[in-house]
């Protein structure tokens, strides 16, 4: 026995003016917020990743690859200079 869930059909939602008024503002706002998050460098600070100019320092020009998983902590500390 099938019934109805009481929800509006999707076709009614996407053809309503209210849907497009709300989404014509929120979708571009999300893109702009994401662009600002990355372009200001806040994404690097929030996630702790190095900025593009910090991958290779003047003292270390090789790629920092961990070669022994059992001594990974020591190797990472050598890479960052601790």
Curated annotation (Swiss-Prot):
Pfam families the UniProt entry points to: Cytochrom_B559 (PF00283), Cytochrom_B559a (PF00284)
Q: Got a GO cellular component term for this one?
A: photosystem II reaction center
Cofactor descriptive note: With its partner (PsbF) binds heme. PSII binds additional chlorophylls, carotenoids and specific lipids.
Q: Where are the transmembrane segments?
A: 21-35
Q: Which SUPFAM superfamilies match?
A: Cytochrome b559 subunits
Keywords (A to Z) from UniProt: Electron transport, Heme, Iron, Membrane, Metal-binding, Photosynthesis, Photosystem II, Thylakoid, Transmembrane, Transmembrane helix, Transport
Q: Look up the record and name the cofactor or cofactors this protein needs.
A: heme b
Q: Which GO terms describe its molecular function?
A: electron transfer activity; heme binding; iron ion binding
Report how it sits in the membrane. Answer: Single-pass membrane protein
**Iron found in the keyword field:** yes
One Gene Ontology BP term is: photosynthetic electron transport chain
The domain of life is: Bacteria
Sites binding heme sit at: 23
Q: What is its main location?
A: membrane
InterPro entries documented for this protein: PSII_cyt_b559_asu, PSII_cyt_b559_asu_sf, PSII_cyt_b559_CS, PSII_cyt_b559_N, PSII_cytb559_asu_lum
Q: Where in the cell is it found?
A: Cellular thylakoid membrane
What family is reported? Belongs to the PsbE/PsbF family.
What is the stated purpose of this protein?
This b-type cytochrome is tightly associated with the reaction center of photosystem II (PSII). PSII is a light-driven water:plastoquinone oxidoreductase that uses light energy to abstract electrons from H(2)O, generating O(2) and a proton gradient subsequently used for ATP formation. It consists of a core antenna complex that captures photons, and an electron transfer chain that converts photonic excitation into a charge separation.
Subunit arrangement? Answer: Heterodimer of an alpha subunit and a beta subunit. PSII is composed of 1 copy each of membrane proteins PsbA, PsbB, PsbC, PsbD, PsbE, PsbF, PsbH, PsbI, PsbJ, PsbK, PsbL, PsbM, PsbT, PsbX, PsbY, PsbZ, Psb30/Ycf12, peripheral proteins PsbO, CyanoQ (PsbQ), PsbU, PsbV and a large number of cofactors. It forms dimeric complexes.
Name the UniProt record assigns to this protein:
Cytochrome b559 subunit alpha
Please name the gene that encodes this protein: psbE
């Amino acid at each position: 026995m099938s019934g109805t869930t009481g929800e509006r059909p999707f076709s009614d939602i996407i053809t309503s003016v209210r849907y497009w008024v709300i989404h014509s503002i929120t979708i571009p706002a999300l893109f702009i917020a994401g662009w600002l998050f990355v372009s200001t460098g806040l994404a690097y600070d929030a996630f702790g990743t190095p900025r593009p100019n910090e991958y290779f320092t003047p003292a270390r020009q090789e790629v920092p690859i961990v070669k022994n998983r059992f001594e990974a902590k020591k190797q990472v500390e050598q890479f960052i200079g601790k």
